[in-house]
């Protein structure tokens, strides 16, 4: 008979938390390093949201509850909608102004 491997035997909660903190740090680093380009900022924010989702799923598996996994799916859905709306706004702004630099967008203030 085939034995189904339980991944919790090999990968502990600490591994998931380390992975999550690394992904969050990469997203934070990208957020601070690429302040001029809005698309890079959106990608960095998505990385940070992914790190939060890894935490939710890891704790959900560790505590043997489904609520964290369900909440993670809801967060991913909302984040996808947020990104789609943000990119649509950026596309319209680029068609009108010809640039998507942060400095040009900050000039829109009244």
From Swiss-Prot:
GO terms for cellular component: NADH dehydrogenase complex; plasma membrane. Gene3D superfamilies: 1.10.287.3510. The keyword Signal does not apply. Disulfide bonds: none annotated. InterPro entries: NADH_UbQ_OxRdtase_chain4L/K (IPR001133), NUOK/Mnh_C1-like (IPR039428). Its EC number is 7.1.1.-. Pfam families: Oxidored_q2. One of its GO terms (biological process) is ATP synthesis coupled electron transport. It is found in: Cell inner membrane. GO terms for molecular function: NADH:ubiquinone reductase (non-electrogenic) activity; quinone binding. Keywords: Cell inner membrane, Cell membrane, Membrane, NAD, Quinone, Translocase, Transmembrane, Transmembrane helix, Transport. Its main location: membrane. It comes from the Bacteria. The keyword Transmembrane helix applies. It is a multi-pass membrane protein. The chain crosses the membrane at residues 13-33, 41-61, 73-93. It catalyses: a quinone + NADH + 5 H(+)(in) = a quinol + NAD(+) + 4 H(+)(out). NDH-1 shuttles electrons from NADH, via FMN and iron-sulfur (Fe-S) centers, to quinones in the respiratory chain. The immediate electron acceptor for the enzyme in this species is believed to be ubiquinone. Couples the redox reaction to proton translocation (for every two electrons transferred, four hydrogen ions are translocated across the cytoplasmic membrane), and thus conserves the redox energy in a proton gradient. PANTHER family: NADH DEHYDROGENASE SUBUNIT 4L-RELATED, NADH-UBIQUINONE OXIDOREDUCTASE SUBUNIT ND4L. NDH-1 is composed of 14 different subunits. Subunits NuoA, H, J, K, L, M, N constitute the membrane sector of the complex. Belongs to the complex I subunit 4L family. This is NADH-quinone oxidoreductase subunit K. The lineage of its organism: Bacteria, Pseudomonadati, Pseudomonadota, Alphaproteobacteria, Rickettsiales.
């Amino acid at each position: 008979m085939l034995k189904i491997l339980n991944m919790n035997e090999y990968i502990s909660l600490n591994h998931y938390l380390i992975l999550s903190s690394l992904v969050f740090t990469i997203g934070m680093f990208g957020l601070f390093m690429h302040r001029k380009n809005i698309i890079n900022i959106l990608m960095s924010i998505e990385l940070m949201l992914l790190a939060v989702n890894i935490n939710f799923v890891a704790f959900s598996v560790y505590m043997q509850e489904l609520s964290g996994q369900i909440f993670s799916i809801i967060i991913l859905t909302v984040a996808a909608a947020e990104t789609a709306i943000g990119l649509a706004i950026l596309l319209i702004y680029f068609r009108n102004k010809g640039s998507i630099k942060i400095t040009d967008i900050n000039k829109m203030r009244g």
